[in-house]
Amino acid sequence: MMKELHPELRENVRLLGELLGQSIRYHLGDEIFNKIEKIRIAAKADRNAEISQRKQLKEVLSGLNDEELAPVARAFNQFLNLTNIAEQYHIVRRRAPASELVDNRLDTIEVVFDRLIGQGVSKDKFFAQLADLNLEFVLTAHPTEITRRTLIQKYDQISECLESLDRSDLLDEEYAKIVERLRRLITEAWHTDEIRYERPTAVDEAKWGFAVIENSLWQAVPDFMRQMDAALLERFGEGLPINVNPVRFASWMGGDRDGNPNVTSEVTREVFLLSRWMAADLYLRDIEALRSELSMTACNGELARASGQSREPYRKILAKLRSRLEATRAWAAEALDSTKKPAAEVLLNNAELIEPLMVCYRSLRDCGMEVIANGPLLDVIRRAQCFGLQLVRLDIRQDSERHSDVMKEICAYLGIGDYSQWTEEEKQAFLIRELEGRRPLLPKEWPASAEAREVLDTCRVVAMQPPEGLASYVISMASDPSDVLTVILLLRESGMRHHIPIAPLFETLSDLQGAADSIGRLLDLPWYREYIGGKQEVMIGYSDSAKDAGQMAAAWAQYQAQEALVKVAAKHDVKLTLFHGRGGTVGRGGGPANRAILSQPPGSVAGNFRITEQGEMIRFKFGQPKVAKQSFNLYLGAVLEASLVPPPEPEPAWREMMDKLSHLAVNSYREVVRERPGFVEYFRSATPEQELGKLALGSRPARRKASGGVESLRAIPWIFAWTQMRLMLPAWLGSDTALQTAVDDGGADTLKAMLTGWPFFETHVDMLEMVLSKVDPEIARFYEERLVKPELHPLGDELRRRAGCAVRLINELKGQDELLLDNPVFMHSLQVRNPYTDPLHFLQVELLVRDRAEGETNKETVEKALKVTMAGVAAGMRNTG
């Protein structure tokens, strides 16, 4: 039985839709408004299983003239965005009961604390784990944020208006004023071009990341710490220790150069400095507010000495800190255009920022003013511990081949051989010999190629940064110990005097299968073990492994790789941090965060968890303070629970079944994607893959190489394209054959046992179910009929049949008649969107036909409308790539 939307959510969706309709009617007139309404009503009737309106719907849309295309597309796109705003606000609204949330399995930290206490976790164990907890979100600029920042800001203001409307004490005139503000914002959004015509630069992307911190995370972090503090105090009589900071942030924006020639050493240098400038500016605002509040005269001896016996000691200390922050901000601004070294007043490490604040904090507590100490001052201390002087630590990512090419050039210039032809053992011996020695390797007047110079310039920029500004150096396609040793040597040769974690990234199926062996060989090297000081980070890639092998085989390979890495780390007495390169979509490792964490192999979390947050997911999870605070609840609660009460080991029979499923799935997936004649042509014809390149989504190219087939396409556009035509193929292809074969071979009972007894398999099946609920065979068929040549239609028939088979299998395993019965709110949310997404699909097909037709005279108008439909479908599906 379908569950309706919560009345308050339904009312907000109705209000926003009504205001949008009024705006469209006023500005475009009755004729176009009536056409839009006719399309909407026909789409809704079609979805409600009344007499099919689909033929009429297609005819109306195909009959639109070029000038009507964009307004119609924009109307449905805007409505879907407004629906998303209403849903996102509802998730965090004050009065929303847990049963009404989009995912009613969300746990707050209070619920998690109580569950852990009920399972016998002692206070000492609890606090010891909290003190050792490290949850780090790595913000990346992967090109999946399709909404312009200008519109995001308006959408945030619309959400604030919805919150204001929730007040129970509103007067009629106050209500009317808020509605008028909503009308104005929706009209502003309607008159704002939703299409980005120029790709953002890597620096633009970094600034967008800084804006998320300034507008949301800056408030959300101390708010969440207060929530944790209160929850601990209530349960244990002891709050969160002031030196415990379980949440941190890093970024790839301006640091990820893998396959992106637009991220240069100069860009990275600029981002480091902009980050320092932004941090100083934000702290200055906080310090100014604290100086206004901390007017007290009573202080302890420590503060009296530090302030020179000042009559207003707190203000005196804060004035000194303000002066140093001003100097830091001025230096960062000046250094953008020069190589000026920081003056003595410039703050260089986090301790210089935090210690003056702690002096004030200790004094207030010593003088009996705990209530003041634990006010805004504590919030600023928490921020300083989380964000530091750098605001957000930067990861550097580069392909291992780029480093090897530099070593090849160096060795050739020195006349010591062809580095690329050496065995792995020879490379290791050479690199360790150089690392143990003291003489420089790089010749002073070495005529390096432009490519080698860029790699070394990046290393020099990294070497110049304070340790607290750096997170990790991630190496793509790293399979041998020499890949890691090379980076350490190049950094040392560039002047690096401290250690930075080096994280090999394993992302293809074969890489994942060999990950533990590779790390084991690395940890077998005595020099390297001494260098890392007992800590090793490894990155697991979800996007490319799923694109390479299909979702099911990739998920099992990721699970097994983590298990094996945990054992290797334990053998060498090394603390392992697994860095999860997940995307927003299921095809790229996405899904509900807490359930994903709780389904990791036992021992793989152990208090440390790094995860990428990509593109549009940054906005959905962290774009507003209350939303960000809820995300912290989900992630931290799950990391704490997975660390203190790890899931059980899977049964041997379950492992055997997953081995079988994985083998069947990868073969089935690759048979279609790699070997099936006509598949690539079908993909490029049936989806808007080639047209996606016209969307200025991010600074990074869609392809690693200018030419090539599916293998050269990045995972994001691969997912994006299939999402647009509603086949969602990357997330389920291969799983259908694997599950069907297992059932046919008598494995249904084993699969059902796995579903109820193994969090990993349960989560995988639930994610499969969620993505299959978005598949629409009829819409996919329409794309095929209009865009694909007839001789390839049998392939489409097969794919749609297989998607239907996957749906039937999931329902059989879960003992249900239709998908999403255990997640009715998500089901209804999808069904609310469908009547608004359907016209965008049909319109997109019409536009693709026109755009691809030779002799199309109104190319610019058609392309603009096409881009709007892509944005609208992404909004309807709540993801892009």
Curated annotation (Swiss-Prot):
<feature type="active site">
    <location>
        <position position="547"/>
    </location>
</feature>
<keyword id="KW-0456">Lyase</keyword>
<dbReference type="GO" id="GO:0005829">
    <property type="term" value="C:cytosol"/>
</dbReference>
<comment type="similarity">
    <text>Belongs to the PEPCase type 1 family.</text>
</comment>
<comment type="function">
    <text>Forms oxaloacetate, a four-carbon dicarboxylic acid source for the tricarboxylic acid cycle.</text>
</comment>
<protein>
    <recommendedName>
        <fullName>Phosphoenolpyruvate carboxylase</fullName>
        <ecNumber>4.1.1.31</ecNumber>
    </recommendedName>
</protein>
<feature type="active site">
    <location>
        <position position="142"/>
    </location>
</feature>
<dbReference type="InterPro" id="IPR022805">
    <property type="entry name" value="PEP_COase_bac/pln-type"/>
</dbReference>
<dbReference type="GO" id="GO:0008964">
    <property type="term" value="F:phosphoenolpyruvate carboxylase activity"/>
</dbReference>
<dbReference type="GO" id="GO:0000287">
    <property type="term" value="F:magnesium ion binding"/>
</dbReference>
<dbReference type="GO" id="GO:0015977">
    <property type="term" value="P:carbon fixation"/>
</dbReference>
<dbReference type="InterPro" id="IPR021135">
    <property type="entry name" value="PEP_COase"/>
</dbReference>
<dbReference type="GO" id="GO:0006107">
    <property type="term" value="P:oxaloacetate metabolic process"/>
</dbReference>
<dbReference type="Pfam" id="PF00311">
    <property type="entry name" value="PEPcase"/>
</dbReference>
<keyword id="KW-0120">Carbon dioxide fixation</keyword>
<dbReference type="InterPro" id="IPR033129">
    <property type="entry name" value="PEPCASE_His_AS"/>
</dbReference>
<dbReference type="InterPro" id="IPR015813">
    <property type="entry name" value="Pyrv/PenolPyrv_kinase-like_dom"/>
</dbReference>
<dbReference type="GO" id="GO:0006099">
    <property type="term" value="P:tricarboxylic acid cycle"/>
</dbReference>
<keyword id="KW-0460">Magnesium</keyword>
<dbReference type="InterPro" id="IPR018129">
    <property type="entry name" value="PEP_COase_Lys_AS"/>
</dbReference>
